[in-house]
Amino acid sequence: MNKVLIVDDHLVVREGLKLLIETNDQYTIIGEAENGKVAVRLADELEPDIILMDLYMPEMSGLEAIKQIKEKHDTPIIILTTYNEDHLMIEGIELGAKGYLLKDTSSETLFHTMDAAIRGNVLLQPDILKRLQEIQFERMKKQRNETQLTEKEVIVLKAIAKGLKSKAIAFDLGVSERTVKSRLTSIYNKLGANSRTEAVTIAMQKGILTIDN
């Protein structure tokens, strides 16, 4: 039988979860905590097989509790909250939570998520999974935009690859040498380079420049 630790600052929620979980003979309640600080202590003392964790609580939040518990234990933790804010979902999953459930979820979904967590899997509700995928896509898109060189920066990079110095590049482009150096700094930052040679090498590896350029 799997030992469950319930963490929530509302007594009525803890009592309701206890009554629900006791209907499943695969689980037994071994403890309950009213905040993250108590949860961290009980995780050490009781060594539960799974933890149901609220997020917003006094003294210590659920996210901080997850972080501290995960530093010492591999106990699967399922977030059970009323909040579906993007940053909470992301941070919770990144900290190692095996699930993110809203408190209006069905008992069937709760038990399925707990069963999956016990097996070491992450099971997310379709709407939450979809939102996390959208967030990941937005992150990747933003990252691509942040690292993508502008047309003017590519022109400078091509000139550098030909061995031209900043002064010569500035003359050819009809801009100031200061502008060229500014674009070069931007190129370094976007490519993670520390020198002209490294910038050209990375650009060729990424396909931004080719030998024909």
Curated annotation (Swiss-Prot):
It holds the Pfam family Response_reg. One of its GO terms (biological process) is regulation of DNA-templated transcription. It is found in: Cytoplasm. The modification 4-aspartylphosphate is found at D54. InterPro entries: CheY-like_superfamily, Sig_transdc_resp-reg_C-effctor, Sig_transdc_resp-reg_receiver, Tscrpt_reg_LuxR_C, WalR-like. Keywords: Cytoplasm, DNA-binding, Phosphoprotein, Transcription, Transcription regulation, Two-component regulatory system. Residues 166-185 bind DNA. Gene3D superfamilies: 3.40.50.2300. One of its GO terms (molecular function) is DNA binding. One of its GO terms (cellular component) is cytoplasm. PROSITE patterns: HTH_LUXR_1, HTH_LUXR_2, RESPONSE_REGULATORY. Phosphorylated by YdfH. Residues 142-207 form the HTH luxR-type domain. Residues 3-118 form the Response regulatory domain. PANTHER family: TRANSCRIPTIONAL REGULATORY PROTEIN YDFI, TWO-COMPONENT RESPONSE REGULATOR. Member of the two-component regulatory system YdfH/YdfI. Regulates the transcription of ydfJ by binding to its promoter region. This is Transcriptional regulatory protein YdfI.
